[in-house]
């Protein structure tokens, strides 16, 4: 389980996050919903160790304290991040990008076996292993980014706006793949503005407003609660 508590981030006098706390179990999808500027991306980066936080931050994964662990060591501990910009190498091929994601220190299976699992999730990538990522569509590049993160065999996968810029068809394909990843035992924490699609696949959700978590619950409860929809979801895409 990923356990996060007391995460506060400030930029000068601006408090971007205030004592954020959440949990993610392996084998579940948790979505963070909020408007632009709510602090969603800041929260993911803080969890991944990419931003300085106020004293008191706690991040634990499987009982291990990751609060002061460097980002590359966090990956080795079982936490992987797919950033909004995808973080892939556009001038390299699909195969080369996947290879860069491999983490021999977490070798529960061979690299070839793990790549076979990734290509099973995203069959289109198997047909394009020698293709340069720069020549691929946005949806295909997102698949490469997620595939590369999965090559590290994470226990928890963090995804920042994975559906951003994708067509409705590609969003459905992507979220179907995320369900399969969840069912394989990986926990997923998504930052999303696409409320309808993300809540449809999520097990639980958190509502973030002005840097504070102002609500959480089962995804079905959030979908059906009129007050929640009006107060927190009404301005988000897909609602």
What are these regions (language model features)?
Residues 1-239:
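Glycine-rich phosphate-binding loops of nucleotide-dependent enzymes
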């Amino acid at each position: 389980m990923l356990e996060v508590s007391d995460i506060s981030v400030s930029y000068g006098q601006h408090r971007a996050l205030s004592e954020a706390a959440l949990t993610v179990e392996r084998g579940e999808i948790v979505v963070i919903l909020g408007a632009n500027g709510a602090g969603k991306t800041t929260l993911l980066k803080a969890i991944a160790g990419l931003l300085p936080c106020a004293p008191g931050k706690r991040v634990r994964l499987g009982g291990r304290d990751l609060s002061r662990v460097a980002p590359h060591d966090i990956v080795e501990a079982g936490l992987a991040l797919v950033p909004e910009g995808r973080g892939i190498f556009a001038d390299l091929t699909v195969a080369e990008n996947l290879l860069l994601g491999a983490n021999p220190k977490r070798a529960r299976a061979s690299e070839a076996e793990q790549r076979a699992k990734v290509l099973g999730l995203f069959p289109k990538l198997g047909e394009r292993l020698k293709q340069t990522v720069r020549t691929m569509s946005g949806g295909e590049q997102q698949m490469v980014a997620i595939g590369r993160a999965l090559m590290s065999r994470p226990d928890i996968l963090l995804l920042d706006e994975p559906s951003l810029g994708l067509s409705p068809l590609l969003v459905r394909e992507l979220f179907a793949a995320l369900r399969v990843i969840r069912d394989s035992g990986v926990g997923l924490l998504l930052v999303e503005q696409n409320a309808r699609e993300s809540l449809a696949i999520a097990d639980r959700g958190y509502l973030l407003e002005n840097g504070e978590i102002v609500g959480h619950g089962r995804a079905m409860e959030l979908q059906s609660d009129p007050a929640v929809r009006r107060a927190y979801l009404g301005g988000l895409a897909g609602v």
